[in-house]
Amino acid sequence: MKIAWIGVGVMGKSMALNLKKAGHLVYVYNRTLSKCEGLEDDGIKVCSTIKECVNDADAIFTIVGYPKDVEEVYLSDYGIFANAKEGSYIVDMTTSSPALAKKLSEIGTKFHVLDAPVSGGDIGAKNASLSIMVGGEKEDFEYLLPVFEAMGKNIIYLGKAGSGQNCKACNQIAIAGTIAAAAEAMHYAESVGLDGNTVLNAISKGAAGSWQMDNNAPKMLNSDYEPGFFIKHFIKDLKIARDTMESKNEELPVLNKVLELYENIADNGLENEGTQAIIEYYK
């Protein structure tokens, strides 16, 4: 299959490489072309415009930063809908607004449009072990399932357009609570004079265990803030979930508190660090 890939950031680059390894013909575009460096050595064609990337593709995948970037990539005169061939499969894997996912599906009637945000960070992207949450027409999901399987292990169809994004919001809400709790537990341990790593070994295999405890708590203890997922993007995700619920006149108090913590450390210059840098709030 000829695949166009737009967005080669922390996760997108590895995902495009995994599609190439699976035998697909992959074309990529990124607004900052320097991020595509080295991809041509792996047999991936680097394009200078969206039009060049998508105009003859069978399937088009996007994973960009913010909903405004999604709108530009899809709806501008130089974007996907204006330049993709009719009948192509178009999948947005950005964590974005459920309302925008529905809008793209409604506008893109000449195409097979899916929303398919992912979870698993840079490690999951590299290892092709991502969780992929898909919304849209079920037959379109089934057609692209072998392609999704080149990037992930836990691939779930959720329902109509926007359902993938709503599921991803659930994912980010759950992460917000667990990563904040892990940081607070590590802070407590060190504040009362315990060795953080010893405490982590004691509690991580019981009821307190979680992916965040296994993967991010050790990084917190080592002040290793290399981003598997940027704080600035997590703030964006939490705001999407908050705004969706506020539109229903409902509140998410735990999410709102964690969002406040992340906005605090972002304001102190840490927006480009990994989400584990939440521990810095306590320092």
In which residue ranges do the predicted regions lie?
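Rossmann-fold dinucleotide-binding core
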Residues: 96-173
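Active-site-proximal catalytic alpha-helix in oxidoreductases
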Residues: 128-135, 160-192, 204-215, 233
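Interdomain hinge/lid region at the active-site interface
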Residues: 209-271, 275
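Rossmann-like NAD(P)(H) cofactor-binding subdomain of soluble oxidoreductases
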Residues: 50-55, 59, 67-130
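NAD(P)+-binding Rossmann beta1-loop-alpha1 motif at the extreme N-terminus of oxidoreductases
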Residues: 1-62, 93-94, 122
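Conserved beta-strand segments of alpha/beta enzyme cores
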Residues: 25, 43-45, 89, 112, ...
